[in-house]
Structure formats: C-alpha cells, structure tokens
C-alpha cells in the first residue's frame, strides 16, 4: 500500500473520519452525481463544490444506494443533513433541501450521520489537491 499515494487522494475529514471522495465541480458532474452506482465503499463519498453559498436541494433520481446528504456553508460548517435519502427510480422523486445556504454538499452512505454523531456546526476538512 502506498501511503504517499493515499495522502494525495482527494478526501475529506468529518468528525475525525477520513472519506476518499469523487469531486463534482462542474454542472455535468453535479447532475450525474452518484447515479447508477450499485455500491460505494464505506469510506468513500462524493463532494459537490459550488462557487458560492445558496439554498441547495438534491434528489435521488436513478441513484441506487441510500445516502446521507450533508450541507456545509462557505466556512465548511455543517448547516443540515438529510439522513437516509432513499433511491428513486420513478419520475416523481422527493427532494432533500438544505435548511440554510450551503456551498459544499457531501454524500456518504446512509447511516454515516448517525454513526458519526454529526451536529449542526461540525466542521468539514477538505483535502482535494
């Protein structure tokens, strides 16, 4: 195992736990998100990077795995979390909105929010370079 290689992998740290992340930093990547994936490692996720804070709303259309959706403001403080967002394969999928302006959105496997014991104000560390 290459420790130096792991250090260079894009990752985030939340409540002391490290998650390797895919980066959604374009509209196309954000629209695709985690659609059509059948599984995701327990220490993996996806980070959505937006140019500024705004009210965010995600849906689970064509997403095959349940997720926790974490919304962070421009200071990387947790604004809100939608726990256990369910997969949706129909036309009318539920939306999961932030409760306040968010600039960063993190998707992890469902159950991580409860496992980590996250609370509003928790800080996300970004290591994307």
Role assignments for model-derived ranges:
Residues 1-3:
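Bacterial N-terminal signal peptides
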Residues 5-129:
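Compact, glycine-rich, soluble single-domain proteins
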């Amino acid at each position: 195992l290459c420790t130096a290689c792991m250090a260079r992998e894009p990752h985030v740290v939340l409540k002391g736990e490290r998650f390797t992340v895919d980066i959604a930093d374009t509209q196309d990547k954000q629209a695709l998100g985690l659609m059509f994936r059948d599984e995701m490692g327990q220490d993996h996720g996806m980070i959505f990077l937006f140019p500024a804070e705004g009210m965010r709303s995600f849906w689970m259309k064509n997403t095959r795995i349940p997720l926790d959706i974490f919304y962070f403001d421009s200071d990387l403080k947790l604004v809100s979390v939608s726990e256990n967002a369910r997969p949706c394969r129909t036309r009318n999928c539920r939306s999961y909105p932030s409760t306040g302006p968010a600039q960063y959105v993190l998707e992890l496997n469902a159950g991580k929010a409860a496992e980590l014991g996250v609370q509003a104000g928790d800080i996300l560390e970004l290591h994307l370079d």
